[in-house]
């Protein structure tokens, strides 16, 4: 009888475990939510992924460079950050189209980039992030 109750306890304990979704997928906002948060100046929930490595204050770098003033700037513009050779040589300017392509798949746009983030799949989330970057 003890082994039966032990199995039942184990089953109940495991029932509380997650559905197998990765945390970032489970916590990702819906497309509608991301679009609503794209209001000028609003920091969208999707930006939390960016904030893991990037600061928004000018000159304050984290694992990645500060994103202050990034919209409209040439790639590798932050003088106090050690960019990859690939990023320095890219010749990119961070406009809406370039940011959208980079956020979708950083390594496809700039092979050799230091950014290991796999990208933001949802176009509405990318649009919300880009709208926010434009305000920094």
Language-model segments: which ranges?
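Sec-dependent bacterial lipoprotein signal peptides
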Residues: 1-16
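Bacterial signal peptide processing site
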Residues: 17-21
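Sequence/structural segment immediately N-terminal to covalent heme-attachment motifs in c-type
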Residues: 33-60, 67
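Solvent-exposed, acidic/flexible segments
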Residues: 39-43, 57-60, 92, 96, ...
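Solvent-exposed, polar/charged alpha-helical surfaces in well-ordered, non-transmembrane soluble domains
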Residues: 41-48, 65, 69, 97, ...
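Sec-exported extracytoplasmic/periplasmic mature domains
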Residues: 51-58, 72, 104-108, 134-135
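Gly/Gly-Pro-rich "capping" loops immediately C-terminal to redox-active cysteine motifs
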Residues: 55-93
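C-terminal capping alpha-helices of c-type cytochrome domains
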Residues: 95-136
